[in-house]
Amino acid sequence: MEKRSGIGRLYQGSFFNRYSRAGGNPGAPSVRCARVRGDDGVLVFTPFGNDRRGTSSTTMKQWVKMMNDIVIDKRGFRLGVGMVIMNRQGELLWGRRVGNPDAWQFPQGGLLPNETLREALNRELDEEVGLSPHDVIYLRETRQWISYRLPKKFRRPEHRGPVCIGQRQKWFLLQFTGKDDAISLDHCSQPEFDQWRWVDYWYPVDHVVEFKRDVYQKVLTEFAEFIR
């Protein structure tokens, strides 16, 4: 049975924090959050109460969703999955992040509490590129988790929620079996990408943002051994 990322047994020593002004918005509510350590050492931040004084339910829902999405290991890395989607010609799916014309990357996303890696993979596959498990063939996953650190300028200030210093990911190699028109970038309310294209296998290593290049080099080198 695949191990889940979730809360597991609660330690008696769990403690509580109070984060104010969700998302840096002065009008947003304060939310009390429990930091809970599971059996596998994973820290899961979940809201257990709130103060709705003068705030809209939409703001609260957005804040609660953000808090529910955060699964952080004991070193401060958010756990997630990444996917290398390859077509029949050996080219890789490459997406441009919304609002940043120079930021291209592979699809990726964080684990939700109590979600398996495969469940996270299937959810992100749908949310980011509009594909289902029936559109791809699972080929391989990286032997180890691979981490990268976020530059300090991209890290969330501590007063705005749990501190995350980077991401720790399991990567999957998927064979795309459908037609290009099956790929859709608007399958969720907040799309990750606004453009996509196929690129040569090693192209991403030199064109992803600098702090992810080592990750991409490791992932593609490992997968290259399999597809030769």
UniProtKB/Swiss-Prot annotation:
Domain of life where this protein originates: Bacteria
CDD domains according to UniProt: NUDIX_Ap4A_hydrolase_plant_like
Keywords, in A-Z order: Hydrolase
Region (RppH domain): 71-228
Database matches in SUPFAM superfamilies: Nudix
Chain spans, region Unknown: 1-70
GO BP terms: mRNA catabolic process
EC number: 3.6.1.-
Nudix hydrolase domain location: 76-221
GO molecular function, one term: mRNA 5'-diphosphatase activity
Class of the enzyme per the UniProt entry, highest EC level: hydrolase
Cofactor annotation: a divalent metal cation
Sections of the chain in a coiled coil: none
GO CC annotations on file: cytoplasm
Motif window: Nudix box: 109-130
Record keyword Methyltransferase present: no
Listed Pfam families: NUDIX
PANTHER family per the UniProt record, alphabetical: M7GPPPN-MRNA HYDROLASE (PTHR23114:SF17)
Function text: Accelerates the degradation of transcripts by removing pyrophosphate from the 5'-end of triphosphorylated RNA, leading to a more labile monophosphorylated state that can stimulate subsequent ribonuclease cleavage.
Protein family: In the C-terminal section; belongs to the Nudix hydrolase family. RppH subfamily.
Protein name per Swiss-Prot or TrEMBL: RNA pyrophosphohydrolase
Species classification: Bacteria, Pseudomonadati, Pseudomonadota, Gammaproteobacteria, Legionellales
